UniProtKB/Swiss-Prot annotation:
Domain of life of the native organism: Bacteria
Name of this protein: Glutamate--tRNA ligase 2
Function: Catalyzes the attachment of glutamate to tRNA(Glu) in a two-step reaction: glutamate is first activated by ATP to form Glu-AMP and then transferred to the acceptor end of tRNA(Glu).
This protein's UniProt keywords: Aminoacyl-tRNA synthetase, ATP-binding, Cytoplasm, Ligase, Nucleotide-binding, Protein biosynthesis
Reaction it catalyzes: tRNA(Glu) + L-glutamate + ATP = L-glutamyl-tRNA(Glu) + AMP + diphosphate
Subcellular location(s) per record: Cytoplasm
Annotated binding of ATP, by residue: 241
Molecular function via GO: ATP binding; glutamate-tRNA ligase activity; tRNA binding; zinc ion binding
Subunit structure: Monomer.
UniProt motif ('KMSKS' region) ranges: 238-242
GO biological process: glutamyl-tRNA aminoacylation
Length: 470
């Protein structure tokens, strides 16, 4: 266990929290918890045109839902702009940065010339060693970057990473409108927040090399870095919040449990032997960066379904019902009768066994809690319309069964007698019972459901179905 570990998650509120961001947050959180450290949350909201409070709230709510809890107050990067400007000016005073007065047109022309020659573009500012022009000229602050040698760091996933300095230009630190760039703001914030370890995607590798130049210019000790492989979709294409990636809120709305999604994210690039089902306590105890692989992680919808089914079945029934009742009420358009929740509580175990998600479970549970008239699927309607006589026979015979005798044995015997007395087929009887009582043909044991509903509810439903086709 390491001493004094501080990690962070620093999302940009230009979109909802997606899988890649959630996994980054999870890995940083687990690393901090494993080492008894702190996990901080910083919202990088300096892009005022694309950031919004709605998206900030969405990110925070998604993290709360996933139970990835940050320590301390949330830091808004926009509240620290004056500090970023202060550091940019400090670099000027220490001759580690300079004012660039090149116009946008001049820079674009320079880029074109490099492109024509097939060279990697690196801005060569003519003002680097000149006196500033007279008058009120637009300017930016650029870092004095090394033009020779390499920038090297040890990554906790990929080992030693070396970037040729010829690829790193004199990056802009402060724009002409006096706003800091991402590269400067991140370095200053991470340093001031005491961040010791940064875990993020491999798409930041070049950013890391650039940020190390800023750390060196300031004489600050950089944090340790771990770059985790990106997530690919099921076709092997890179996932991003602009392409194919669902937001965490969409997984929630689709009926995925947070425990299932966390387990799913955990196994995207990290492993602990052959373990697939991992509790959060086990994850905290076992998590280490050296178990993160270097190959991209891929989406696997079947695995997510498996995990979700597992966590639905291991969550107590009362909690699951509390989750699905709002979905049911939205579907049927009225408040569920408390008495009928008892039917659902008695019958939900069978439904849980084969469900993929809470939305599916809610739809499969409708017949338990619906008032008459219940909803019928198309197949049930066809059966009801063509079996009026059978429904009448079922109603008349079941009406003779007393409440105290309404049990599995009595009902099974009666159905056998009806088949014998009326020369019909048993599967036709069961189809009629399912169609009239639950409105569908595919369901758990109809006898068990009838015992659960008891006599009055079953007779009322059969009577309604029979009378539909009088």
């Amino acid at each position: 266990m390491l001493n004094h570990v501080v990690t962070r998650f620093a999302p940009s509120p230009t979109g909802h929290l997606h899988l890649g961001g959630a996994r980054t947050a999870l890995f940083n959180w687990l690393y901090a918890k494993h080492n008894n450290g702190k996990f901080l949350l910083r919202i990088e909201d300096t892009d005022s045109k694309r950031s919004s409070k709605e998206l900030i709230d969405s990110i925070i709510n998604s993290m709360i839902w996933l139970n990835i809890q940050h320590d301390g107050e949330i830091i808004l990067q926009s509240s620290r702009i004056s500090r970023h400007i202060e550091i940019a000016n400090q670099l000027i005073l220490n001759d580690k940065a300079y004012y660039c007065y090149c116009s946008e047109e001049e820079i674009n022309l320079e880029k074109e010339q490099y492109t024509k020659k097939g060279l990697h573009y690196k801005h060569n500012c003519i003002w680097k060693n000149r006196k500033p022009p007279t008058g009120n000229c637009s300017k930016v602050i650029r870092l004095h970057s090394d033009t020779e040698g390499i920038t090297e760091f040890k990554d906790k996933v990929y080992g030693t990473i070396a970037v040729n300095n010829v690829q790193l230009d004199d990056m802009v630190l402060l724009r002409s409108n006096n706003t800091p760039t991402y590269l400067l703001s991140v370095v200053v914030d991470d340093y001031d927040m005491g961040i010791t370890h940064i875990i993020r995607g491999t798409d930041h590798l070049t950013n890391t090399a650039r940020q190390l130049l800023i750390y060196n210019a300031l004489g600050w000790k950089p944090p340790e870095f771990a770059h985790i492989p990106l997530i690919h979709d099921e076709n092997g294409n890179k996932l991003s919040k602009r392409h194919h990636a669902l937001g965490i809120h969409e997984y929630k709305n689709a009926g995925i449990l947070p425990e299932a999604l966390v387990n799913y994210l955990l196994r995207m690039g990290w492993s602990h032997g052959n373990d697939e089902l991992i509790t959060i306590d086990e994850a905290i105890r076992w998590f280490s960066i050296d178990k993160v692989g270097q190959s991209p992680a891929g989406l696997d919808s079947k695995k997510l379904e498996f995990l979700n089914n597992h966590y639905i079945n291991t969550t107590n029934n009362a909690t699951i019902i509390e989750m699905i009742i709002p979905i049911i009420e939205k579907t049927i358009g009225y408040k569920v009768n408390t008495e009928k929740i008892g039917y659902l509580l008695n019958g939900i175990n069978e439904l849980k066994k084969r469900t993929k998600n809470l939305v599916n479970l809610a739809n499969e549970s409708l017949f338990y809690v619906e008032d008459i008239p219940i909803s019928f699927d198309q197949e049930s309607l066809i059966i009801i319309k063509s079996n009026h006589d059978i429904l009448s026979i079922l109603y008349d015979n079941l009406s003779k069964v007393l409440n105290d005798d309404w049990n599995n044995s009595t009902l099974t015997s009666m159905i056998k007698n009806i088949v014998k007395d009326y020369n019909t087929k048993i599967h036709n009887i069961y189809h009629c019972l399912r169609a009239s009582i639950i409105g569908r043909i595919n369901a758990p044991s109809i006898i068990d459901i009838m015992v659960n509903f008891q006599r009055e509810e079953c007779l009322n439903r059969i009577k309604y179905a029979r009378d539909m086709v009088k």
